């Protein structure tokens, strides 16, 4: 591949040549799909997957040049070195690592850090807590990225006003806040109607990127020499200290690369790869090389090269298009945050959250009010606190590089445990990725005092919350299990001293079907009655994203009064107990909602010095438990058929 990229072709031709080779490798095991359907999916991928990385040219090259400048002076070798670094970073990290390897590590078609964690946990039985910890760190870093992306993207687009109309400079931050507040405010309405234009707008954006870059490449065609890795290597070795800092800024060109994997389940591998190889990658290269050529011929333009190289007649349209593109990029990140939050709830990493479906046709379109509120507040606070996209740039890289580092570690386990690769085959590849990831991560971590503290702070708080929830639920389960009575013993006692039998069916939800549910025990204690039919219901989340309806329910008859039912959902599926119980008819149980009551136990938690957790963590867990959404709503049980029985537990 490097041979093709070092030839005499233009960057677009080189990327297309590389695309031919890479696409063949990426799709060697897939059949052809219908062309029209493929075009639609590719267009959709442009609007959802590539918004973040597609808007990076607005600020990435500018920040890299600022880092590379010595006393504010840029040499020709510096400019060529920076653009060469960007080219090879995009090639090695996005095209090689993600396109050729990471996108193959799907969990039944789904991607994302939590999908990868679930996949690895299923394959690596020995150390589930270690993998869970890695997955939690990855998810926390993703949310940190989700906070910073809308802030830096929209703010960088609005800074174009400084070029179009300098007198509007004081309004950049207020206008950014207005746009972001509006964006988060309309989330509850759903994006189904407007999402249809996301793809075409982003396609226009990439055309504008490529066209403006190609036009200015002719300012200094010798800029294409930077395709040669010699310029990147020379830049890294001549002044290592300056180069190290610059590498952290160069990484801004790759922010959003993780979206290729995160959105795998929405579009599939082939549309995502084709969109990258044939549209996004070439257009990004043209723009970056165009900015470099423009600066080589207009040395004074390093302040805002992206907008300064746009002709005056096209400045306003470009600012408007950039704003639209960054809003779309922000929307994609917000939607991704909802998806990851839902996965985290299903995998019991976060407490239950209220999840609203905004589309009757598309089940994946959801809105989570609490996530939206917290995300929106954090984004606005960042904009008001940092005020300039250049100030936010330092905070941006840490979250994304950390996430990529976690992905690489988990990818090694996938290679050796699931793909059954020999260590001698997998290790050199992973070590290569780790060297690159560690270089970018270390170059960004030194920016903690410049703003990186924001990213680390967000991730740390989220890790603390998620780990407290995981640890607390385990302690609670162990505590209640010690106090619970085995179901066998209760059934045996009822056989000797039968309670009063009343007509109807009682469904008792429990996490442990071997123990008598707390609600059943309190019902017998206070009401002294037993229903004619009793169902001990357990809801299980599988380590795969989707579970077919045929595999949803397992039913076993315990005795003439009791039945054990297990419902299994994928971590991407919203539990609907009513609908799932309807599937039990084919298994011999004729479920009738009109004669059925659901008994749920509502626990009142109190902190205890004997919980095994620090007191502050006990209190945090109790707070999280109190803020969890109602089980009746979460499991979609008709409220008129629910009986809640309260219990007090000292954890």
Swiss-Prot record:
Provide a GO CC annotation, any one: plasma membrane
Keywords linked to the UniProt accession = Cell inner membrane, Cell membrane, Ion transport, Membrane, Potassium, Potassium transport, Symport, Transmembrane, Transmembrane helix, Transport
- Give compartment(s): Cell inner membrane
**Which Pfam family name is an example for this entry?**
K_trans
Q: What chemistry does it catalyse, as a reaction equation? A: K(+)(in) + H(+)(in) = K(+)(out) + H(+)(out)
How is this protein situated with respect to the membrane? Multi-pass membrane protein
Domain of life of the native organism: Bacteria
Q: What is its main location?
A: membrane
Gene Ontology MF terms: potassium ion transmembrane transporter activity; symporter activity
Residue ranges spanning the membrane: these are: 41-61, 82-102, 130-150, 163-183, 194-214, 235-255, 276-296, 309-329, 366-386, 395-415, 426-446, 450-470
Q: What family name appears in the similarity comment?
A: Belongs to the HAK/KUP transporter (TC 2.A.72) family.
**Reported function:** Transport of potassium into the cell. Likely operates as a K(+):H(+) symporter.
Checking HAMAP family in the record gives: Kup
**Protein name stated in the entry:** Probable potassium transport system protein Kup
Species for this entry: Brucella canis (strain ATCC 23365 / NCTC 10854 / RM-666)
Its lineage opens with: Bacteria, Pseudomonadati, Pseudomonadota, Alphaproteobacteria, Hyphomicrobiales
| Gene that encodes the chain | kup
